[in-house]
Amino acid sequence: MTALSPIPVFDAADTAALLAYPALLATLGQAVADYAAGEIVSPERLVVPLQAGGVMLSMPSSARDLATHKLVNVCPGNGARGLPTILGQVTAYDASTGEMRFALDGPTVTGRRTAAVTALGIQALHGAAPRDILLIGTGKQAANHAEALAAIFPEARLHVRGTSADSAAAFCAAHRAQAPRLVPLDGDAIPDAIDVVVTLTTSRTPVYREAAREGRLVVGVGAFTADAAEIDANTVRASRLVVDDPAGARHEAGDLIVAQVDWQHVASLADVLGGTFDRSGPLLFKSVGCAAWDLAACRTARDALAARRAG
């Protein structure tokens, strides 16, 4: 690509097509190891205020082969304007020359890499492929997770609990084409057969209060501020804890912060993938995300584009 060549800019649908979940999962596994080894630089995100309660989030990252920058605007008032609440792009650059290579849709990158990190955590922590997964939530994050988990664990039943039986049923009907084994949870009680629970809500108070139990992995995704917790503090304190990004988790993992956990006893996903973590006992995986995972998504897109050109 020369300096005068047009820069490819991909919309949400095209971005999703470049980020197939199996490929994204494999790239994320390598990125987790690279980040832990200091081979990916991923500073804490910069938050800049916008008008009407909005914020601009700047999240750069760099490695030897690629540099990326996610710039996302979150504007809570956009719903009333008929606009998306979250807007933004992830741009990829040559790590040596700084030349821009392509741009991806920011919310799509975030949604898909977040769901892929959950799948990676389940693979690493659960051992055998799960048979029954419960998704708590019926929003966009739940939709991304339904598609991702159906792709990675095609034999698993995906149960859904929403704020009502009707919302869960409507969600399943809307997304069953992407996740054929999607079913609404029958009642409020969580069956003993559920071996993985994933919380995917915007609730600031616990939506999961079950006692910690061996054989059931709990994954917290929705809470992303220090004062919000989807998982009951007693459940958190009784579990062995793993986070995707230890640096970010200390500021953003509200489930753990509210429970006042001892951070010396919190392991990283890199520890698990590296084989230094004992998976016995009740397990809880908290995902907060970081720019290194966006870089992994850009690596996946880069490789997909190269395969298209070669084919």
Swiss-Prot record:
Disruption phenotype: Disruption of this gene leads to loss of growth on T3LHyp, D-proline and D-lysine as a sole carbon source, indicating that this gene has dual metabolic functions as a reductase for Pyr2C and Pip2C in these pathways. On the other hand, there is no difference in growth on other carbon sources, including T4LHyp, between the wild-type and mutant strains. One of its GO terms (molecular function) is delta1-piperideine-2-carboxylate reductase activity. It holds the Pfam family OCD_Mu_crystall. Its EC number is 1.5.1.1. Pathway: Amino-acid degradation. It catalyses: L-pipecolate + NAD(+) = Delta(1)-piperideine-2-carboxylate + NADH + H(+); L-pipecolate + NADP(+) = Delta(1)-piperideine-2-carboxylate + NADPH + H(+); L-proline + NAD(+) = 1-pyrroline-2-carboxylate + NADH + H(+); L-proline + NADP(+) = 1-pyrroline-2-carboxylate + NADPH + H(+). Induction: Induced by trans-3-hydroxy-L-proline (T3LHyp), D-proline and D-lysine, but not by trans-4-hydroxy-L-proline (T4LHyp) and by cis-4-hydroxy-D-proline (C4DHyp). Gene3D superfamilies: NAD(P)-binding Rossmann-like Domain, ornithine cyclodeaminase, domain 1. Optimum pH is 6.5 for Pyr2C reduction and 10.5 for L-proline oxidation. Keywords: NAD, NADP, Oxidoreductase. GO terms for cellular component: cytoplasm. Transmembrane segments: none annotated. Homodimer. Catalyzes the reduction of both Delta(1)-pyrroline-2-carboxylate (Pyr2C) and Delta(1)-piperideine-2-carboxylate (Pip2C) to L-proline and L-pipecolate, respectively, using NADPH or NADH as the electron donor. Can also catalyze the reverse oxidation reactions, albeit at a much lower rate. Together with LhpH, is involved in a trans-3-hydroxy-L-proline (t3LHyp) degradation pathway to L-proline, which allows A.brasilense to grow on t3LHyp as a sole carbon source. Also appears to be involved in D-proline and D-lysine metabolism. Does not show ornithine cyclodeaminase (OCD) activity. Belongs to the ornithine cyclodeaminase/mu-crystallin family. This is Delta(1)-pyrroline-2-carboxylate/Delta(1)-piperideine-2-carboxylate reductase. It comes from Azospirillum brasilense. The lineage of its organism: Bacteria, Pseudomonadati, Pseudomonadota, Alphaproteobacteria, Rhodospirillales. The gene is lhpI.
